[in-house]
């Protein structure tokens, strides 16, 4: 049996004793790179269902992009992209694209290049983590859907508050094993859904 210890964090509970608890700001750095001068006109979108995609592949409605993309921020492949106003509803994804996004989006990447960004992305996508964010933002409406997902409308969480949160940090080799396992499981589920 693996030794665990109490995190003192209600959403997390116990975690493996050889892991660390760290503030997000010490694990991930925010990329704040403006698209000015314009380096790309490829606008990316982020949805809870589809993740980070080119805007023209987006299903359903949503905000229309601005024609002037010089105020947008740049996102790179390997960046965790999150909508600061919809984190609670699962608007978090790992970008496979270089493009520009609305300035309300955060782009995060590990401080250490050896760490597995997928591990952090999966952590942020857990319902338990997303529910722990209540009270951090300023919002208008919060609803729970029939499948247990939380839906919010404009619940903005400032990066300075987000960065102060503690998350469990596995050793690097274990981060990779966890992310590989979840990638394989998600691919299997996606294949079953597509059939």
Where are these regions (language model features)?
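Non-catalytic DNA-recognition/assembly elements of restriction-modification systems
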Residues: 2-36, 164, 168, 172-177, ...
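Sequence-specific dsDNA recognition surfaces
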Residues: 7-8, 25-36, 40-41, 46-77
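A short glycine-rich beta-alpha junction/loop motif
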Residues: 4-10, 85, 99-106, 140-173
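Ligand-binding loop in jelly-roll beta-barrel domains
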Residues: 111-117
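Short, ligand-facing micro-motifs at secondary-structure edges
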Residues: 42-61, 83-106, 118, 122, ...
């Amino acid at each position: 049996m693996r030794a665990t210890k109490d995190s003192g964090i209600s959403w997390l509970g116990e975690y493996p004793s050889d892991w660390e608890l760290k503030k997000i700001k010490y694990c991930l750095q925010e990329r704040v790179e403006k698209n000015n001068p314009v380096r790309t006109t490829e606008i990316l979108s982020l949805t809870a269902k589809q993740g980070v995609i080119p805007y023209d592949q987006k299903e359903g409605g949503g905000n229309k992009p601005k024609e002037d993309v010089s105020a947008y921020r740049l996102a790179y492949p390997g960046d965790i992209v999150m909508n600061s106003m919809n984190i609670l509803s699962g608007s978090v994804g790992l970008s496979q694209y270089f493009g520009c996004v609305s300035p309300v989006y955060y782009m995060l990447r590990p401080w250490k290049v050896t760490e597995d960004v997928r591990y952090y992305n999966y952590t942020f996508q857990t319902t338990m983590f997303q529910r722990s964010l209540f009270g951090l933002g300023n919002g208008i409406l919060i609803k729970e859907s029939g499948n247990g997902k939380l839906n919010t409308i404009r619940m903005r969480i400032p990066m300075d508050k987000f960065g102060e949160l503690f998350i469990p940090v596995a050793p690097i080799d274990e981060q990779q094993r966890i992310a590989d396992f979840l990638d394989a499981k998600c691919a299997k589920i996606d294949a079953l859904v597509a059939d």
